[in-house]
């Protein structure tokens, strides 16, 4: 049994968001611009910066024990790994990305079958080949080094498979989405032998739990206040909460303390109602984790 867990931090667009998420979960990761080996304030962790496109193969080989990458790249490499959990976050939003089949706006193509014999361009070559092969649709799939949208506009290919969140860039280039091929979110993946190691599995599960709790706390705040005891029922009815607000009696008083967790955006509309119902000493505080 090893007392060191080798963790792959995704280099690139997810890098800063991942480091911030670890900080909220309780780990401080320090990354130097001249090093691929980040420092971390945990003697049991050894972090490495790895491109998400390659994370799956290194986890599968056991070069690293666990890492975070988009599910799209795990599927692209057909990696034989354990998917520990989803980690729905990105540098922009918390929505999944979509890999979509795209053609020119004036194309006659309405479904994947209409592309039989066509040439497609994409970064996701392996997945795209398997997708069409499974449906017995003969196509040629070429790797794209970038500017993929321009290739179908310039007639360099018949269609593309491209990643998008909203589809706005695709529409702006006078292109049309035929259908979605895959939805992807960041996932934590583990090497199968590492997952079977009791110490490593417990460490991985601890990290996953705390990272997910930090994600759950995003946009949430705690609200605490005092109120007359006879107003407690009315106040708790207007307070949203995961289960029910916490109500406790103040020492030697007929007043109570009320505490609840709610979405930060709800505070501005709820506080005036709380004041009208007799609440006093209202305190709003940030949350790092919800477990």
From Swiss-Prot:
Cofactor(s) demanded: Mg(2+)
EC number: 2.4.2.17
Transmembrane stretches, start-end: none
Compartment list: Cytoplasm
Keywords, ordered alphabetically: Amino-acid biosynthesis, ATP-binding, Cytoplasm, Glycosyltransferase, Histidine biosynthesis, Magnesium, Metal-binding, Nucleotide-binding, Transferase
Main location: cytoplasm
Pathway the protein takes part in: Amino-acid biosynthesis; L-histidine biosynthesis; L-histidine from 5-phospho-alpha-D-ribose 1-diphosphate: step 1/9
SUPFAM superfamilies tied to this protein: GlnB-like (SSF54913), Periplasmic binding protein-like II (SSF53850)
Entry's Gene Ontology molecular function annotations: ATP binding; ATP phosphoribosyltransferase activity; magnesium ion binding
Catalytic activity field: 1-(5-phospho-beta-D-ribosyl)-ATP + diphosphate = 5-phospho-alpha-D-ribose 1-diphosphate + ATP
InterPro entries named in the record: ATP-PRT_HisG_long (IPR020621), ATP_PRibTrfase_cat (IPR013820), ATP_PRibTrfase_HisG (IPR001348), HisG_C (IPR013115), N-reg_PII-like_a/b (IPR011322), N-reg_PII/ATP_PRibTrfase_C (IPR015867)
This protein's GO CC annotations: cytoplasm
Regulation: Feedback inhibited by histidine.
Reported function: Catalyzes the condensation of ATP and 5-phosphoribose 1-diphosphate to form N'-(5'-phosphoribosyl)-ATP (PR-ATP). Has a crucial role in the pathway because the rate of histidine biosynthesis seems to be controlled primarily by regulation of HisG enzymatic activity.
Family affiliation: Belongs to the ATP phosphoribosyltransferase family. Long subfamily.
Protein name listed in UniProt: ATP phosphoribosyltransferase
Organism phylogeny: Bacteria, Pseudomonadati, Thermodesulfobacteriota, Desulfuromonadia, Geobacterales
Gene (name only): hisG
């Amino acid at each position: 049994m090893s007392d060191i867990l080798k963790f792959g931090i995704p280099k690139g667009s997810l890098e800063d968001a991942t480091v911030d998420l670890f900080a909220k979960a309780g780990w401080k990761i320090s990354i130097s611009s001249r090093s691929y080996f980040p420092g971390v304030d945990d003697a049991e962790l050894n972090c490495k910066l790895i491109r998400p496109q390659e994370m799956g193969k290194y986890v599968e080989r056991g070069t690293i024990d666990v890492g975070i990458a988009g599910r799209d790249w795990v599927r692209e490499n057909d990696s034989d790994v354990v998917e520990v959990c989803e980690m729905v976050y990105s540098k922009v939003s918390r929505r999944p990305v979509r890999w979509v089949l795209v053609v020119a706006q004036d194309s006659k193509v309405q479904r994947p079958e209409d592309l039989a014999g066509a040439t497609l361009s994409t970064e996701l070559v392996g997945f795209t080949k398997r997708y069409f092969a499974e449906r017995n649709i003969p196509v040629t799939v070429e790797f794209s080094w970038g500017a993929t949208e321009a290739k179908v506009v310039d007639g360099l290919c018949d269609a593309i498979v491209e990643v998008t969140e909203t589809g706005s860039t695709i529409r702006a280039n006078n292109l049309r989405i035929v259908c979605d091929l895959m939805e992807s979110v960041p996932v934590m993946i583990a090497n199968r032998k590492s997952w079977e190691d009791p110490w490593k599995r417990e460490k991985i599960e601890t990290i996953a739990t705390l990272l997910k709790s930090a994600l759950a706390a995003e946009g949430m705040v705690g609200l605490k206040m005092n109120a007359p005891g006879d107003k407690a029922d009315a106040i708790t009815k207007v307070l949203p909460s995961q289960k029910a607000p916490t109500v406790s009696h103040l020492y030697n008083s007929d007043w109570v303390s009320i505490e609840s967790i709610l979405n930060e955006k709800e505070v501005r509309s709820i506080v005036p109602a709380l004041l009208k119902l007799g609440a006093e000493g209202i305190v709003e505080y940030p949350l790092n984790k919800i477990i």
